[in-house]
């Protein structure tokens, strides 16, 4: 009867909660490993005195996940790191603030019909097409040389 349906519903809700918790913990772990990977790449580049900027592409993380990742690595980025969310053609520009990411987006995204904004340490630019993302990143990298 009704109690049976209610019990099944509560059981499904509990399984849902457990799955969401597990997903959250997995994402947190994977984001932490990705941050460590980016930071070790930064250390290698600093040791080789490379002027190279880091650019990584993602399709499984959400925009919120990339924002979290950006905040974690930001203080360690001397130049600019580009975190690209491929499904939405969104580029996060991340830095320690020495290079103003918000200003770079405001001054350059519109060249490729992009929109966006942000502050000195974190900004995002959203484009209509994937090729605009690549061209935008190339432009910013040349601008920073």
What residue ranges belong to the model's regions?
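Terminal appendage regions of diverse proteins
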Residues: 1-145
């Amino acid at each position: 009867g009704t109690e049976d349906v209610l019990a099944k519903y509560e059981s499904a809700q509990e399984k849902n909660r457990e799955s969401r918790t597990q997903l959250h913990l997995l994402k947190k772990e994977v984001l932490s490993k990705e941050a460590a990977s980016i930071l070790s790449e930064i250390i290698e580049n600093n040791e080789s005195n490379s002027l190279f900027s880091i650019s990584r592409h993602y399709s499984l993380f959400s925009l919120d996940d990339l924002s979290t990742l950006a905040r974690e690595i930001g203080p360690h980025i001397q130049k600019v790191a580009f975190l690209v969310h491929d499904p939405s053609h969104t580029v996060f520009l991340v830095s320690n603030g020495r290079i103003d990411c918000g200003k770079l987006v405001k001054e350059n995204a519109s060249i490729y019909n992009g929109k966006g904004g942000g502050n000195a340490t974190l900004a995002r630019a959203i484009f209509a097409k994937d090729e605009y993302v690549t061209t935008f990143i190339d432009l910013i990298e040349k601008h920073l040389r």
